[in-house]
Amino acid sequence: MGRSPCCEKAHTNRGAWTKEEDERLVAYVRAHGEGCWRSLPRAAGLLRCGKSCRLRWINYLRPDLKRGNFTADEDDLIVKLHSLLGNKWSLIAARLPGRTDNEIKNYWNTHIRRKLLGSGIDPVTHRRVAGGAATTISFQPSPNTAVAAAAETAAQAPIKAEETAAVKAPRCPDLNLDLCISPPCQHEDDGEEEEEELDLIKPAVVKREALQAGHGHGHGLCLGCGLGGQKGAAGCSCSNGHHFLGLRTSVLDFRGLEMK
């Protein structure tokens, strides 16, 4: 056999309590005490369930109830009792005078539980969560990591700059891809060197041409005069007193003159 209902559902009010119902319940409890909650509604003239009357009295109408927010000492006591008793809110409320089990349960779920999670503590086991106090994943780099990354970037910057310069530097800077016929480019230094070489070669070429010209006109130059000998000396076979350019040697030959 099951337990009989405490009241008739057909004649029972449901919903929010009115001010008149609260006054009747308070007056009856003050006059007769709490007594039996199953018979209290009929004796007090209330069309309410016995359970509803009990919860209304305990949670809202008791004169010793504390009003206001929980204090820091109460928070610490609730955490300690919860670590020992778990979710047995009635036993926890018995050790907190002026607080109800329903009030403590609501306060635990809305405030203390979130506070423990924010501190890195598991609200069920009351032990620190693996991974430290931070329960949320942060994508911001730590200061030490940021400094190390900046130093590494600064160290790699010159190397990357050198590699970029080496890649961008042309392998053949003087290469001309224009398809046209033009004289080769000559530098000023090359021109000066060529002029010096021409100055060294020119006397020999002129001397050779002069020898050929002398033979062509029948005025040959003897070997002795060609080697620097004196004109008209012994062994000189120059004809008509002309040198290799066709001029008279007596006019251009100053070697016979004595310096005074």
Swiss-Prot record:
What the record says about the induction of its expression is: By wounding. Triggered by MYB69 to repress lignin biosynthesis.
Q: Where in the cell is it found?
A: Nucleus
Tissue specificity comment: Mainly expressed in the aerial parts and, to a lower extent, in roots.
Where does it sit, as one GO cellular component term?
Answer: nucleus
Q: Which residues cross the membrane?
A: none
Which Gene3D superfamilies would you find in this protein's record?
A: Homeodomain-like
Q: Give the main location.
A: nucleus
Q: Does the keyword Nucleus apply?
A: yes
Q: Domain named HTH myb-type: which ranges?
A: 9-61, 62-116
Alphabetized, the UniProt keywords read:
DNA-binding, Nucleus, Repeat, Repressor, Transcription, Transcription regulation
Q: Which residues bind DNA?
A: 37-61, 89-112
Which CDD domains does the UniProt record give?
SANT
Name the Gene Ontology molecular function terms of this record: cis-regulatory region sequence-specific DNA binding; DNA-binding transcription factor activity; sequence-specific DNA binding; transcription cis-regulatory region binding
Q: Name one Pfam family in it.
A: Myb_DNA-binding
Sorted alphabetically, the Gene Ontology BP terms of this entry are: negative regulation of DNA-templated transcription; regulation of DNA-templated transcription; regulation of lignin biosynthetic process
Q: Which domain of life is it from?
A: Eukaryota
Report whether Chloroplast shows up as a keyword of the record. Answer: no
* SUPFAM superfamilies cross-referenced by the UniProt entry: Homeodomain-like
Function statement? Transcription factor that negatively regulates the expression of caffeic acid O-methyl-transferase genes (COMTs) and of other genes involved in the biosynthesis of lignin, thus preventing lignification.
- Identify this protein by name: Myb transcription factor 42
Q: Which organism is it from?
A: Zea mays (Maize)
Q: Which gene specifies this protein's sequence?
A: MYB42
